[in-house]
Every structure is written in structure tokens, then in C-alpha cells.
Design a protein with these regions (language model features):
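Zinc-dependent deaminase catalytic domain
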Residues: 1-165
């Protein structure tokens, strides 16, 4: 399934084994009905630079999770800091792709939450576009600086909304 997604998005993938990505994805399911998956790709070459799945952090009493977009950005930044990747790979910017995949392999709505949107805005000099899946499996694309949080109905994640319940 991951190979199909990567090829349909025309992502060049020389760094990661699709079977390993798929294993990470399905290991993340646990008791969840779906998993969010985020890819970070080079705007210039469309090369896959980083990816991540959401996961429960288990550190807090409420059900907080590490969001895939946030984690994929952190992985990319860590690679740059530790010099495991050269800055020239992202000089022309990156695109963030967010997908939600159900246990039945359906692609559903994966609009980034408010927290992830704010994190991306703090890195707007690096991020060119944000792409996400809608409930029909289509990919929606916006330049980060042109995203309208009111029009797109970007809101807090369920973990933030349910924090004190």
C-alpha cells in the first residue's frame, strides 16, 4: 500500500524501504481505528526526506499523542543538526504531506490540527506547501502561507479538546 501511495504522489524514494514504512505504519495502529502518516519531501526533487506516524506518548494522563507532521519535522531537523543530511537537500524548501489511513486501507481526512499548523508556520521559511488527504481520498494542496485557518476549519486536535475531561 505504501508503495502505491508513494508512486501516486510521484515521491522519489531512495532513502527508505517502503516495507519498513508500512511496518512502522501498522505497528502504530495498536487499538486505534486509523493512523496519521506524514511525509516530508524536497520541493525541488520530490525526494522523500523524512516520514513519521502518530503515536501515543504515554507520558501524560490524558490521551496525548505525538502528531505525525510534528514528529516528521523533528526528525528532519535532527538529521540536519546531526549532519546526517546536507542543507542543500532542502535549500529550495520542503512539502509536508499528511495522510490518515484506516485499518481497511482507506485514505481519510488528514487536515493538520492547529498545533501542527502553528509549528509549520514557525518554519514557514522552510515549508513551501502542505498537502493532506480529504475524506474521499483526494489530495488537497495549499502553499503554507496561503492557508486560511477559518476557511479550512483548522482546529485543535481531539487530544487538546479532551485534555481535561
Amino acid at each position: 500500500m505504501i508503495e502505491t501511495i508513494i508512486s501516486s504522489l510521484a515521491i522519489r524514494n531512495h532513502r527508505f524501504n517502503p516495507a519498513a514504512i508500512e511496518r512502522d505504519l501498522f505497528d502504530s495502529f495498536g487499538s486505534q481505528r486509523y493512523v496519521h502518516l506524514a511525509f516530508i519531501v524536497s520541493s525541488k526533487t520530490n525526494e522523500l526526506l523524512s516520514y513519521s506516524c502518530n503515536c501515543k506518548d504515554g507520558l501524560l494522563p490524558y490521551k496525548r499523542s505525538l502528531h505525525a507532521e510534528d514528529q516528521a519535522l523533528s526528525i528532519l531537523i535532527n538529521k540536519l543538526v546531526k549532519k546526517k543530511m546536507e542543507f542543500k537537500n532542502i535549500r529550495s524548501g520542503i512539502n509536508v504531506i499528511s495522510l490518515r489511513i484506516t485499518r481497511n486501507n482507506e485514505i481519510k481526512l488528514a487536515l493538520p490540527c492547529m498545533r501542527c499548523y502553528k509549528r509549520m508556520m514557525r518554519n514557514k521559511n522552510l515549508i513551501n506547501s502542505v498537502l493532506w488527504s480529504d475524506d474521499d481520498g483526494n489530495i488537497i494542496s495549499y502553499k503554507l502561507t496561503e492557508m486560511d485557518i477559518e476557511k479550512l476549519k483548522i482546529r485543535d486536535s481531539s487530544g487538546v479538546r479532551n485534555r481535561y475531561q
